[in-house]
Structure formats: C-alpha cells, structure tokens
Amino acid sequence: MQAPRLWWVSGPGGMVNPQRDHLLSTADFENIESSESWMDLPNMIDFIDWKIHFFDFAILSALQVDRFGNINTVVVGDRARPKVRGPGTVGISALCGLAKRFYVVLTRHDKSAFRPRVDFICGAGHLQGGDSRERAGLPPGGPKLVVSPLGVFDFEPQSKAMRIRSLHPGVSLQQVQDATGFDLLVKGTPPVTMWPTEQELNLLRTRVDVRGTLQRKFP
C-alpha cells in the first residue's frame, strides 16, 4: 500500500519476499517455504556492500539506542559481567554502516532503552554527532527515524542529535522527556502522530498480522 514495489529480505535468514499469514522471526527458516528466493550469508554480505547499495533501508530493533542513533543488541552493562546478554550483532553492524538508511523500532520507551550512550555500539548511527560518521569513513545515511510506544523521533541535521518529530495521541512532552535518559531536542509544540487510516488498519489485520502479533508487542 505504502510501498507496492518493496522487496523484503528477511534479515539473517536471507529469505526474499516471504509470504506468510502470520509474522515470524526474520531468522525463522519456515519463511523459506513461501519465499521467492533465498540468499546464503556470503551473498547477503555482498548485497550490503556500500558500492552496490542494494539495500535502500533496514528496519531494526535494539536493547538500547542513544541520542545519536547508535544501537546496541549485544550487552547491557559491563561486557565482562553483563546484566543482560543480547542476541549479538547478527548483521546489524553491516546494515547500519552500509544500507542507505535505517529505522529503529522499539517496543518500550524508558531510560534503560533510551540512553545518553549505549553500553556497546554494534550498529553505528551518527557516532558522536555532527560529521563524526563521515569522518569515521562510513557512507552518509545512518538512522532516519526512531519509533517507540511514545512517539516518533528524527535527528537534527547539523548536530545529529535526536529530536521529537511527533508524539503519539495522549502522550505529553513531559511524559516522553521523563522516560528518556537524555534531553531530546524539540522545536515548538510537537505535532500528534497521525492515526492509521481504516484502510491501513484493515491491511494490517487481514494481510500483514492476522494473528495479532503486533498488538501483543505494542499493547
């Protein structure tokens, strides 16, 4: 509907355009049964190469995200004695560095998820802000948006610091700032995130997410 010619490559599994009646993990090999094609890991890495730019964008999640859009899926706390051990980088380093842009979607919004600095950078955002990403030798692009249960956030063009793009209906500016571990940039009164249309909801409920997985993740 929004992107009729979209190609979906199912993460580390390498499945292209799997057609399922319910959502599975991107690494679940059940996806291969309905996929148009499949790529092994070496071919996946070749497609991510910045000279090819096969991937227009990636959609990722994380344990932590910081004010410059760096993400962490590895550990929470000291790497030697972590409080939480995550799934690892699972290709995120390559996608954040070499896809044209990426989007971060989180199922929670609190100070443990929105950190001044992530405990471990496994996906490079705007690093220390400003032009630090380009100075590190990474191609331009990086994080475009962060979406949480409280709002939508983008990055100020010069400083590359996270700012409020919109707040979800019923969410106050104070509420989102209190739930964030750093000061979010804000210009004026943030607009309210638009409600999905009836057509969009119908598509989600009858084609994309028949079993209501998203409703359980985002109550």
Where would I find each of the regions flagged by the language model?
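Acidic/aromatic/glycine-rich contiguous surface patches that form carbohydrate-binding/processing clefts
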Residues: 189-219
